[in-house]
Amino acid sequence: MIYMFSKVPRGSINHSLVDSVAYLLQSITSKLKNDKKIFEFEELFAQYIGRKYCVSFPFARTAIYFALKVKNLPKGTEVIMPPISIKGILDVVLSLGLIPKYVDLDLNNFCFDEQKLSNAIDENTGAIIITYLFGTAPNIEKLIEICKRKKIFVLEDFSQGLNATVSKKKLGSFGDCSIYSSSAIKQIDTFGGGHFFSDDKELVSRMRKEQEQLYPSKRIFLLKKILRNLMYNLATNQIIFNIFTDPLLKALKIFGTDVNRMTGNRDQQPIKVIPNEWFRSYTAFQACVGIRELKKVQSFDHKRIAHAHKVMENAPSIDFGQRTNKDQHTYWQLVAYAKNPETFIKNLRSLGVDACTSSLELLSGLKEYPGSTNMPVAEKVHSKGVFIPCFSRMSKWQKNRVYEAIEIIDS
């Protein structure tokens, strides 16, 4: 009977369903402004990453906006960007009058190709955003060496790389500063939030001043995020997914809806004005959630890492880029390259495993934006990288179904 309900969703919220309901109820009356509680979370988070300071904003894109703004880079300065990321980061870079410049990826670690990065940096390059995709650790020491030699400002985006390490040092602790997004389905999910980290006291002081100028938070925005989180949690609940969500996805597919992206397709049009919502304060309620989530993230990661390793062991002929340096990664997503992703996903779904591809944008391919260009490796990662379910709250039955399915695909 249990095995009947063991079909596996593509992902899951880290909060339990009970916690999601409790958070929704608590958020209705919880105090939103409490600087002491926010600072407590910031201190704990900074210590956890191995940084001296943390400053919290409503979104990662907001933190990146201010990190670039306080550097006072001249308009027209180039910012090296990952070809795969969220569109909001591109929007804030352009809003500051800066020019995006893309560098292609390394196929095995989803981060910048070292030689291509070195070749791309010139006298007009002022900053770089190093993004770690899917919980995979690149040779960050080499990338930092290249950037420091060329004297450019290094910002790490480790939103998908929490707890991944290089030389026993956590990603997010290498650059001049770093950013973590605590949005839905992240390892630490506080119903939104973008956290800025640095050891540079002067830089942090400037960021703190920007934080103080943010608009007051609005409870309705927080409630919407928590409700959306709860709905996703319900949809991926083991029983509800098997009875309702999985049949719904099949029906949508029949009627021509693209259901192969992780969280669906997103608007690709440039925004004319940055929304005020991006500049509202992070709340004390979110900080309280963060303090609680910090205590369990490592144990959750251990479960996911063990699952990822077993999947790769069970499928020796499937091309997993993350096999290289596998003990350094945390596998926020486990990525298999497929020659025909549509068929690969269809076969997995026929075996009860809901696989998908990334919902992140191929920024370098957005024709409506300046700087668009061909990035062959990034295009392969974006179009042919299939996510094998790899989340921490999988049941034993769900894990076994993934192992069995991947063995059949591999044979």
Indicate where each model-derived feature is located.
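PLP-dependent aminotransferase-like
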Residues: 69-165
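Conserved N-terminal helix/loop that builds the PLP phosphate-binding region
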Residues: 1-20
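PLP-dependent aminotransferase class I/II
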Residues: 11, 36-44, 48-54, 127-131, ...
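Short beta-strand-to-turn element immediately C-terminal to the catalytic PLP-Schiff-base lysine
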Residues: 180-181, 195-200
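Phosphate-binding glycine-rich loop
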Residues: 36-78, 89-96, 102-104, 169
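Conserved N-terminal alpha-helix of the aminotransferase class I/II PLP-enzyme fold
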Residues: 14-62, 84, 304
